Structures are given as structure tokens and as C-alpha cells.
């Protein structure tokens, strides 16, 4: 293919597509650029796999540090495991792409997006999403696109398309909208208590620009003479399909009509029906067409059974407006909350139950040195709030190897983290690093929103002064023709057989996080608005249940949580605190048992489980960095004695001398008669001479000054 370049204007900024220059052996390749950010995206298809019942789509997103002119750290000086941001971008690409592939497709598909140049203005993620659509169209893969994505920011009262990093940090909203010709297909947002109506308008605003990008892709494909591929779906043998349908339709209908609230009982009943039809087929003669079809396609029975169950469940919701567990469309499952469920060795804990979904969240208060350093291309180099989500196999009654967190766990953890972020206290107000781990102990839908609720409970139990508590609910959708039903607080089967998973988190006053995924090719703004508005009473209902358990953060922290004290010093004094080779700071740590973190701006944070240890370390640092003046009083230690006096350390690396005549208000014959090495003595600065020497005295010190010095401070 010869080289083709197409430019698209998006809200006054240019997006450039370059085709035919790179990766000639990939199925499709595009270089998508905006500003100095460039992302190379490829899509490739290989032959199908036997015996699988899912779409084997693999999405990889790579960030090369050369893109920002940097050399990787570490011994190997090479990029290693993808950072969390890369994993989240993989999901951002995958989620709007997957519904647009035919659900019968079993060929291996791989989309690889590589950021090869990046400035500090344009985020590469939405470029990668749009680039994935272009590359797939070029690869002539069956695909119901085009698809495109944009980011929407809110600064003041104005929506901004594809805001810069600076505009994102200054704004109240960071929203990504992806869509197809059929409607919105994916939404991802973090927000600072944005009102429901404002969020709806932002999504609509973004989708209008998405439509422009879709139009540009169609024009490009037409110019290149590429026609979108349509392939016939493989058909299930009609004889087998009819056999299964006749035997399972009524029994499945009966199970669904019981409105069984216990998922396990319902699943067992459905499994029994499926097994009975398998037994019936096995008993047929080997030459029977149904038996032959089942042997040729072993997964066909399960496929047909799922299709029948899906149709009946959806019909029940659409026609009768009743769900499989008997709930109304807008009804939330029973909720219970507990805090302080673990011993105080953990700093805070919260247990959140919603139906059969159970999440245990544990909060840990760390020191500033526990902040996570982010070695990636993005401007934020540190994280002081971490949320980790774990989904063990026993939570769904299964067995499987337990390895490192998968993309789903990383994504769910990041969503719950994002929901709480705007409500966390500032670093100045509460200098702790915060980590919450959410353990999913039982899953029947909406575990990510359960993690939001559990995180709030555990942080409040730990004494973290949240601005406001946050709760969340997951909304679902059943769409049959023109009939649409929005479901509140979906459970597993409704997620599995439904069309949408729409998670909304926020406070009583607005939305803080949003995530929408579709299984259909797009959704109208009318339905999205209905889902967002319907989520609010559910969130508030859940919030009321949480506040009935704990209505404000605890006033006292766990006795095992570190106590933090801060002191501000002149940045030029940092070297003095650290000392040669770290000798001074190590000495303070060894003497007091406190941990000391120093920032470039001179903020010193001292932490220790024992508050007295932290106070002692702060006293030492304050003494070292204090500008000395005549009349200041200190508690010092005698370090050496000479015939004419004694040297006293009043702070690390700061010594003064008491002349023998200043040891007492009477004549002293020998210095040793008054003090010995190691004695702690209260002294006052008598004079600072022009050579920087400190002359001390024990005379003329008021009792109040002496008491203050011994108590840990110094008076002037």
C-alpha cells in the first residue's frame, strides 16, 4: 500500500493518520499523531482455534521511555513489566473494540499500540483507541465499526475536547467517551462530584466529536477502496438446536419463574436441566442426526442452552418487569455493613455485603516514604493513595491457580481508587500514604462497587478524614428491539446475559467515578441518561446503610498506626540533616527509632508508632536547623571535658562550651566536680562570637525555661 496521510481537525487540534509507511507485514497499521505524541497501532489476524467458545482478542499497549527521551532505570536499563497505566490503557482499547467483533469469530486477533513519541501535553490513550479502529479496518477483519474515542474535560463551565495534562489536573472531570455509528459504546470517568445532568451533557458533547472521527475513518477507507468485511456466522445444526429447545425451554422457564434469591440454588437447577439434555442425547443411537451433530460440535449443547436461558431471562424482564430473583427493576439487594471487623493490628477494616457479594477492605496508613514511584511516561510521578483489588477463585466457588493480579483486577482496583480520590484529605492536612486492599470474599456481581463501599468504611474506621463518604452501584440493561429496561444493582447472571455494565460511584452531592461497558454495538443518549439518573437513588440508599454503621471518621487511630509529625526547614539545610553518607540522619533514626522522610521543598515528616519517639526526633531536627540566638535554652549532653570547661552538644553536629566560671553561681574548683561526660544539662546560649563559636552558661535560667527544655522544646 502506498503512503497515505489524512488530517482531521478536532476542536481546533489536528489528528494525523499515516498509513502505508510502517509495519508492512501487519494486517493493518496506522501511525496516529496529535501534537508531538505519536502512537503506532497494528491489528493482525491469524487462523482460528479449535474447541474454544470465546473471541480470542489480545490487546497490548506498550510505552517506550525513549518516547520521552528517557533511559529506563534498573540494572538492565530496559522496559520491564508494563506499569499499571499501560494495563489500564489496554483495557481502554479492548472494551469498546470487543463488542464490535462478531461473537462467533474464533480467529486469533491481536491489537498492539506502541507510544513511540510523547510530549507533556497530549495523552496517548485516546489516540490508541481510535488507532485500533483504523488498524482493524485496514486489516479487513469482520468489524462493526468504525469506532473512535475522545477525552472530555471540564474547566470552569466549559467542556474541552482532548484536554492537555494540565487542563485535566485543573478541571473537575476526566471523561473518555468511545462510540460507534450505533451510539456510545464505552465511558470511563473520574470526577470531582460532577452533577448527573452535567455528566450526561459531557458524554453527549464527547459523542458528537466521536461521530466526526467515525465519519473521517469512513472517508479514509472509501478513499483507499477498502470494503468492510462481512463473513457468514457458523450455524448450529437445526436438528440439535430444536431437540435441545424442546426439552429445556419449559424447565428453564419454571426455574426462572421461581424468583430464587440464592444464586447457587438457581445455578444448580439450571445445570441439572443442561445435564439432563446431555444424557438424553447420549442415549440416542450413534447414527441419530442429533447425536452426530453433538459429537461433531461438543460445545453446541451449551451454546444453545445459554441462548435459550438468555432469551427467557430477558423476556421475563422486558415483558413482566421482574428479575430472576424477584426484585423490581430499580430495587437494590439487601445490604449490611460492619467496621472494625479485624483486630487493631490492621489500621482500619470494613466489611460490605450486598446480596451474595461480600467485600472485605483493609486500610493501612503509611509514611510519605511509602508513596509509589511511577516509572512511566506520565507527569504524575508519585501516588499517595493505592487501592488493590483481589478476586480469589473461592469467591465464585471455583478452583484455579492464584498468580499475580490480572488486567481485570488491576482495572477494578483502579476504578475504586478513582472513586475515592477526590474525597481524600490533602497531603498538608493528612500526610499519610494510604493503601486499601479489597478482598472479594464472595462474588455475585458489582464487586468493584462493593470495593468502593468497603474502601470508604475501612478508611473511616482508620480515622482518615474523608471530605465525604463515597458509595457505588452497578446498573444493567436489557434491550430487546425498541424495548429497553434499565436494571439497578445487577447480579452475576444479569451481567452475563445482559447488554450493559454501568458502574456509578459518588457522594451524596455528585459523581466521582463512572465506567460503562457494552455488549451491544452502541447505546442512545436517552438510555444513558436514564441509567445515570436511576443510579442516584440506589447510591444514596447504599450510602444511608453505610452511614448507619459509621457516620464519620474515627477520632482516634489504631495504636499500631504510625504517628506523623512534620517540620519545615530551609531546603539548604537538607544536607546538614542527612550528613555525610547519611550518617546524621541514620544517627537520629537509631537514637529515636523514628523514620524520617525529607522532601525537596524542605518538608520533613517524622513517623513512629511511639509518639514520644517521633517528638524526640523532631526536637533533634528542630535543634539542628534552628537559627541560634543568645538567650536560647537547650537540654544538651556533655561530650568532653577540658580544664577550663565542658563541651555540650545542644543538637546533632552543634556543640558549645561552658566555661568553668559559667557552671555554677559559686567558685568551681574542677569541672569534673559539676559535670561528667554523658550528663544531660540545661544550658543557655550566652554568646555567639564572630567566629561562629557558641558560648554557653548554666546561670540565669528561669525554672520555666528549664522545664520546657527538659520537656522536649527550647525557650528563647
From Swiss-Prot:
GO terms, molecular function: 3'-5'-RNA exonuclease activity; magnesium ion binding; polyribonucleotide nucleotidyltransferase activity; RNA binding
Cofactor(s) of this protein: Mg(2+)
Subcellular location: Cytoplasm
Protein name from the UniProt record: Polyribonucleotide nucleotidyltransferase
GO cellular component labels: cytosol
PROSITE patterns referenced in this protein's UniProt entry, alphabetically: KH_TYPE_1, S1
Domain of life the protein comes from: Bacteria
CDD domains for this protein: KH-I_PNPase, RNase_PH_PNPase_1, RNase_PH_PNPase_2, S1_PNPase
Pfam families: KH_1 (PF00013), PNPase (PF03726), RNase_PH (PF01138), RNase_PH_C (PF03725), S1 (PF00575)
Source organism (scientific name): Acaryochloris marina (strain MBIC 11017)
Predominant location: cytoplasm
Keyword DNA-binding: no
Residues annotated as domain S1 motif: 631-699
Amino acid at each position: 500500500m502506498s503512503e497515505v496521510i489524512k488530517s482531521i481537525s478536532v476542536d481546533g487540534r489536528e489528528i494525523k493518520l499515516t498509513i502505508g509507511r510502517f509495519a508492512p507485514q501487519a494486517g493493518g497499521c496506522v501511525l496516529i499523531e496529535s501534537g508531538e505524541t505519536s502512537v503506532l497501532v497494528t491489528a493482525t489476524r491469524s487462523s482460528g482455534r479449535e474447541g474454544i467458545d470465546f473471541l480470542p482478542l489480545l490487546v497490548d499497549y506498550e510505552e517506550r521511555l525513549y518516547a520521552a527521551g528517557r533511559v529506563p532505570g534498573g540494572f538492565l536499563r530496559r522496559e520491564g513489566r508494563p506499569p499499571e497505566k499501560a494495563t489500564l490503557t489496554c483495557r481502554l482499547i479492548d472494551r469498546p473494540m470487543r463488542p464490535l467483533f462478531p461473537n462467533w469469530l474464533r480467529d486469533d486477533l491481536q491489537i498492539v499500540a506502541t507510544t513511540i513519541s510523547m510530549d507533556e501535553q497530549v495523552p496517548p490513550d485516546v489516540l490508541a483507541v481510535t488507532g485500533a479502529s483504523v488498524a482493524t479496518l485496514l486489516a479487513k477483519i469482520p468489524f462493526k465499526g468504525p469506532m473512535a474515542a475522545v477525552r472530555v474535560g471540564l474547566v470552569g463551565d466549559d467542556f474541552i475536547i482532548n484536554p492537555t495534562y494540565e487542563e485535566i489536573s485543573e478541571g473537575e472531570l476526566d471523561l473518555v467517551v468511545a462510540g460507534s455509528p450505533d451510539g456510545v459504546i464505552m465511558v470511563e470517568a473520574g470526577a470531582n462530584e460532577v452533577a448527573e445532568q452535567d455528566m450526561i451533557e459531557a458524554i453527549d458533547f464527547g459523542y458528537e466529536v466521536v461521530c466526526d472521527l467515525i465519519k473521517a475513518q469512513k472517508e479514509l477507507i472509501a478513499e483507499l477502496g477498502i470494503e468492510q468485511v462481512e463473513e457468514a456466522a457458523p450455524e448450529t445444526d437445526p436438528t440439535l438446536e430444536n431437540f435441545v429447545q424442546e426439552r429445556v425451554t419449559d424447565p428453564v422457564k419454571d426455574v426462572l419463574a421461581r424468583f430464587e434469591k440464592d444464586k447457587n440454588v438457581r445455578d444448580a437447577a439450571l445445570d441439572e436441566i443442561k445435564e439432563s439434555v446431555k444424557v438424553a442425547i447420549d442415549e440416542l443411537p450413534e447414527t441419530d442426526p442429533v447425536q452426530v451433530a453433538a459429537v461433531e460440535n461438543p460445545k453446541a449443547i451449551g451454546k444453545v442452552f445459554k441462548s435459550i436461558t438468555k432469551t427467557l431471562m430477558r423476556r421475563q424482564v422486558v415483558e413482566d418487569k421482574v428479575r430472576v430473583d424477584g426484585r423490581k427493576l430499580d430495587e437494590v439487594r439487601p445490604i449490611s455493613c460492619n467496621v472494625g471487623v479485624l483486630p487493631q493490628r490492621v489500621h482500619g477494616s470494613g466489611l460490605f455485603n450486598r446480596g451474595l457479594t461480600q467485600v472485605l477492605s483493609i486500610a493501612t496508613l503509611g509514611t510519605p516514604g511509602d508513596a509509589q514511584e511511577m516509572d512511566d511516561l506520565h507527569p504524575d510521578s508519585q501516588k499517595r493513595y493505592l487501592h488493590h483489588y483481589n478476586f480469589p477463585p473461592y469467591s465464585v466457588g471455583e478452583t484455579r491457580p492464584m498468580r499475580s493480579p490480572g488486567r481485570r483486577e488491576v482495572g477494578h482496583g483502579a476504578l475504586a481508587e478513582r472513586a475515592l480520590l477526590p474525597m481524600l484529605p490533602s497531603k498538608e492536612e493528612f500526610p499519610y500514604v494510604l493503601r486499601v486492599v479489597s478482598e472479594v470474599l464472595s462474588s455475585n456481581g458489582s464487586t468493584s462497587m462493593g470495593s468502593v463501599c468497603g474502601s470508604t468504611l475501612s478508611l473511616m474506621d482508620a480515622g482518615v478524614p474523608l471530605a465525604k463518604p463515597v458509595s457505588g452501584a452497578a446498573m444493567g440493561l436489557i434491550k430487546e428491539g425498541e424495548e429497553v429496561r434499565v436494571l439497578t444493582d445487577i447480579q452475576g447472571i444479569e451481567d452475563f446475559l445482559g447488554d450493559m455494565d454501568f458502574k456509578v460511584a459518588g457522594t451524596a452531592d455528585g459523581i466521582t467515578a463512572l465506567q460503562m461497558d457494552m455488549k451491544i454495538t452502541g447505546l442512545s443518549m436517552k438510555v444513558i441518561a436514564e441509567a445515570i439518573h436511576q443510579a442516584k437513588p440506589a447510591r444514596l440508599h447504599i450510602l444511608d446503610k453505610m452511614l448507619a454503621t459509621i457516620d464519620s471518621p474515627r477520632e482516634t487511630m489504631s495504636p499500631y498506626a504510625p504517628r506523623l509529625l512534620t517540620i519545615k526547614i530551609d531546603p539548604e539545610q537538607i544536607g546538614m540533616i542527612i550528613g555525610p553518607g547519611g550518617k546524621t540522619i541514620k544517627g537520629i533514626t537509631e537514637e529515636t527509632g523514628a523514620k524520617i522522610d525529607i522532601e525537596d521543598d524542605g518538608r520533613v515528616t517524622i513517623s513512629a508508632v511511639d509518639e514520644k519517639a517521633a517528638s524526640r526526633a523532631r526536637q533533634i531536627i528542630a535543634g539542628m536547623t534552628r537559627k541560634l540566638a543568645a538567650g536560647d535554652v537547650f537540654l544538651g549532653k556533655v561530650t568532653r571535658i577540658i580544664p577550663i570547661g565542658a563541651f555540650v552538644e545542644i543538637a546533632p553536629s552543634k556543640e558549645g562550651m561552658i566555661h568553668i566560671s559559667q557552671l555554677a553561681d559559686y567558685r568551681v574548683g574542677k569541672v569534673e566536680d559539676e559535670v561528667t561526660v554523658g550528663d544531660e544539662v540545661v544550658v543557655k546560649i550566652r554568646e555567639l562570637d564572630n567566629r561562629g563559636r557558641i558560648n554557653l552558661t548554666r546561670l540565669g535560667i528561669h525554672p520555666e525555661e528549664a522545664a520546657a527544655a527538659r520537656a522536649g522544646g527550647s525557650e528563647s
